[in-house]
A protein has these predicted regions:
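Short loop/turn motifs that initiate or flank beta-strands
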Residues: 2-276
């Protein structure tokens, strides 16, 4: 428990009593150090005897000169690891999130890796094998603890996206023009729907509204439930639209094609017009 206390309640075995007599014990003794060990010597400190049963009177006994020992056992810890989905069942000690029962403000780390029973997103996934997962000294000593159980919380992998289109006069960013990135391994997903950018005009934008885009299962084991678009970086580029111009004029003995003669402009968006 990270202290040198030897509580009377822990010193439950009383030896060298007469017959069936018993005594009770109160107070706290002291150990030389806080660490795990067998039959560690207890200094009496405030430990005191009190009358018990079957005729046991404290006045007939003394703790002075006796042998007083306490065994300090390793405290079992339950560890929780946490990481994003990565398409593997690897549970690395380096992804340690928390322990449940560290004492006295102590901390420990973990090394090695185990194998989880599932690779998919969930909380509290058990280990198929602890592998070589091990406790490592922090401000506390690993030797004072034992690893009882380990689980891993696997969260959704955050996707990024990028895309582009030719200027079309609207703020739509179609999923068909968007490429997803940060997928695990060789997995793929299918995206559909329409996102929204902040302006219809040519430029580079961060997609401001992804609520219209959804992801669905893809290939090579890609499950939409293991991924999220929320929190990712989503960029979209609107490129210039190429237009054509045409027209006619009378022969004038020059090679000039005056803007005023090129009166037909094609491939403009909607009812938009330009001057030349």
């Amino acid at each position: 428990d990270a202290t040198t206390n030897a509580a009377a309640s822990d010193l439950s075995t009383h030896s060298n009593l007469v017959g069936s007599q018993t005594l009770s014990l109160s107070g706290t003794g002291t150990l030389a150090n806080k660490h795990v060990g067998s039959n560690k010597t207890v200094t009496i400190n405030t430990l005191a005897l009190a009358d018990g049963s079957n005729g046991g009177l404290a006045a007939n006994y003394t703790l002075t000169g006796g042998t007083h020992q306490l065994t300090v056992n390793q405290r079992p810890l339950n560890a929780t690891l946490a990481r994003q989905y990565d398409a593997t069942t690897t549970a690395a000690g380096s992804t340690l999130s928390s322990f449940d029962a560290l004492q006295g403000g102590e901390n420990l780390t973990m090394s090695g890796s185990g194998t989880a029973v599932s690779k998919n997103v969930a909380n509290g996934i058990a280990m198929a094998s602890n592998g070589n997962l091990a406790l490592v000294d922090g401000t506390g000593s690993a030797s004072n603890y034992s690893l009882n159980s380990t689980v891993i919380n696997i969260s959704k992998r955050v996707l990024n996206s990028s895309g582009s289109k030719t200027y079309d006069g609207n703020t739509n960013a179609l999923a068909s023009a968007i490429t997803l990135s940060n997928l695990a391994s060789s997995e793929t997903l299918v995206d559909s729907g329409t996102a929204t950018i902040s302006s219809a005009n040519v430029g580079s934008y961060t997609i401001s509204n992804l609520t219209g885009v959804s992801i669905a299962d893809g290939t090579n084991g890609g499950l939409a439930s293991n991924y999220t678009l929320t929190g990712g970086t989503h960029n979209f580029i609107v490129n210039r639209r190429v237009i054509g111009v045409s027209g006619t004029r009378l022969y004038d003995a020059t090679t000039n094609a005056a803007a005023s003669d090129l009166s037909t402009h094609s491939n403009l968006v909607g009812s938009q017009t330009l001057s030349l």
